[in-house]
A protein has these predicted regions:
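Short strand-coil-strand connectors
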Residues: 71-75, 98
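A cytosolic small-molecule/anion-sensing beta-strand core signal
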Residues: 64-65, 80-81, 99
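A short, N-terminal "cap"/entry segment at the start of jelly-roll beta-barrel domains
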Residues: 1-35, 120-137
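Short acidic-glycine-tyrosine-enriched beta hairpin
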Residues: 74-89
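Conserved short histidine dyad/triad with adjacent acidic residue
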Residues: 39-54
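Glycine- and acidic-residue-biased ligand/ion/polar-headgroup-sensing regions
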Residues: 56-58, 62-68
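Ligand-binding loop in jelly-roll beta-barrel domains
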Residues: 32, 89-115
């Protein structure tokens, strides 16, 4: 079966840390597929993920609008529209917006654990429109 979703019809998740929101297009809840997690993300100017890594998970960002920096142990690199960022499993990283940022995110498999190295547990909490909280694993 094929799944077709429109972003305006899907639930938006808003980070408990201001400036970040996401919409999942592929998740276990939407498709009964747990092999990957995919969706779009929007960051306000200056918003950032915590410095973190994912155990057992490859991570991709495709930047569609805006400018950002990607921080890894190798340094900080500026990225913008058309750039694809690949983060291997267990690679430490942080994405920080320079301008309002819009990007597509893909993680596989969706059976992973996130470890925060610089940030707080609140960085993994996302509020759903129904008031429930989704905790990023």
């Amino acid at each position: 079966v094929a799944y077709i979703f429109n972003e305006n019809e899907l639930p938006k998740l808003v980070s408990t840390v201001p400036g970040r929101e996401r919409i999942f297009f592929v998740s276990k809840e939407l498709t009964d597929v747990n092999d990957m997690l995919a969706g779009i993300m929007r960051y306000a100017k200056g918003a950032a993920s915590p410095y973190h890594y994912h155990k057992n998970c490859e991570h991709f960002y495709f930047i569609m609008e805006g400018q950002a920096t990607v921080e890894t142990p190798e340094g900080v690199t500026e990225v913008g529209p058309g750039d694809m960022v690949f983060i291997p499993a267990e690679e430490r990283h942080r994405l920080r917006s320079i301008t309002p940022l819009f990007y597509f995110e893909f993680q596989a498999p969706n059976r992973f654990q996130t470890t925060i190295l610089d940030g707080t547990p609140a960085d993994l909490l996302w509020e759903k429109v129904d008031g429930k909280v989704w905790v990023q694993s």
